[in-house]
Amino acid sequence: MERLTVTLGERSYPITIAAGLFNDPASFWPLRAGDQTMLVTNETLAPLWLDKVRSALEQAGVKVDQVILPDGEQYKSLAVLETVFSALLEKPHGRDTTLIALGGGVIGDLTGFAAACYQRGVRFIQVPTTLLSQVDSSVGGKTAVNHPLGKNMIGAFWQPASVVVDLDCLQTLPARELASGLAEVIKYGIILDRDFFLWLEENIDALLALDGAAMAYCIRRCCEIKADVVAADERESGMRALLNLGHTFGHAIEAEMGYGNWLHGEAVAAGMVMAARAAERLGQFETQDVERIIALLKRAGLPVTGPETMPPQAYLPHMMRDKKVLAGELRLVLPLAIGKSEVRGGVPHDLVLSAIADCQQA
């Protein structure tokens, strides 16, 4: 078992990583006998994990209600959020309740935002079931729902009480979802950890085969990096923005193509190549390193080009709604080398369009 801590003073919390955690009632710290909870999951995951998690909680004397939502990015919306609020109010649940997010990034983001809003804030626990959520979205307190005009535009910073990562969940993960998660894994190597990127080049096949030791190390290392970044910059005023490599381009793809048609990691993968091409055109990133990124993404089963039906000009309106835009200026996360990156403003729009076009022709 691995246990890490996200250090945020009195709001610090543990990340527990191991196989078989759902079998142990003690995994769901800080819940105690008599606590009231609302377990939020989706229609795909409920048959797989709901009974197991519910049983563990009830063994510990925890009171469990549940709400089962439709599955898909298109349901990460205000309308579905209201479904969660209605379930909480109908019981009713008070300010001392705990929400439990059992699912991937959509469930985690939506449940976390519900927790941030309900009665002006209640406790919640992240129980991520996808690789993407285990290595990224469950850690750090970013919660949100989407708007038709932009991804994650309505949300709050609201830290969980704990994160419970049961490695057994990956055994039921579809191959496409596994690849999507690997995009965020590869991102960490590009932005902050060259040695980890080199390790990924050597071990990507083991991760695709769900090798237990390789996957445990991979998730732990990603969570270590994320925890350190969040501890240093919780509200994304500086260093934390580096975690958005590829996301400005990727969110544009998701919004333009319709939420759910491209998985988040797929869009981020294409976006990271676009960011690398932009950095290459600026003369700050070597062509051979662009090719290494492309090669690793391809081996992970990820796209390295944008949608054929989305011309470069379609990206900019979405990109200008990005949360990193300041005073009307587009700011991009760009690599400087494998393992080093920066947030850069003032990148000419023509250069951005050319970088996107480079990827369309790849």
Curated annotation (Swiss-Prot):
Annotated residues that bind NAD(+) are located at 71-76, 105-109, 129-130, 142, 151, 169-172
Q: Per its UniProt entry, which superkingdom is the organism in? A: Bacteria
Cellular component (GO) terms are: cytoplasm
List, alphabetically, the Pfam families matched. DHQ_synthase, DHQS_C
The note describing how and how many cofactors are bound reads: Binds 1 divalent metal cation per subunit. Can use either Co(2+) or Zn(2+).
Q: Per UniProt, where does Zn(2+) bind?
A: E184, H247, H264
Q: What protein name is recorded for this chain?
A: 3-dehydroquinate synthase
Principal subcellular localization:
cytoplasm
Q: What is its EC number?
A: 4.2.3.4
Q: Where in the cell is it found?
A: Cytoplasm
Query: Which keywords label this protein?
Result: Amino-acid biosynthesis, Aromatic amino acid biosynthesis, Cobalt, Cytoplasm, Lyase, Metal-binding, NAD, Nucleotide-binding, Zinc
What the record says about family reads: Belongs to the sugar phosphate cyclases superfamily. Dehydroquinate synthase family.
Gene Ontology terms, MF aspect = 3-dehydroquinate synthase activity; metal ion binding; nucleotide binding
Q: In which pathway does it act?
A: Metabolic intermediate biosynthesis; chorismate biosynthesis; chorismate from D-erythrose 4-phosphate and phosphoenolpyruvate: step 2/7
Q: Tell me the first and last residues of the signal peptide.
A: none
Give the record's GO biological process terms. Answer: amino acid biosynthetic process; aromatic amino acid family biosynthetic process; chorismate biosynthetic process
Q: What class of enzyme is it?
A: lyase
- Cofactors per UniProt? Co(2+); Zn(2+); NAD(+)
Q: Which HAMAP family match?
A: DHQ_synthase
Protein's job: Catalyzes the conversion of 3-deoxy-D-arabino-heptulosonate 7-phosphate (DAHP) to dehydroquinate (DHQ).
The species this protein belongs to is Cronobacter sakazakii (strain ATCC BAA-894)
Q: Which PANTHER family match?
A: 3-DEHYDROQUINATE SYNTHASE, 3-DEHYDROQUINATE SYNTHASE, CHLOROPLASTIC
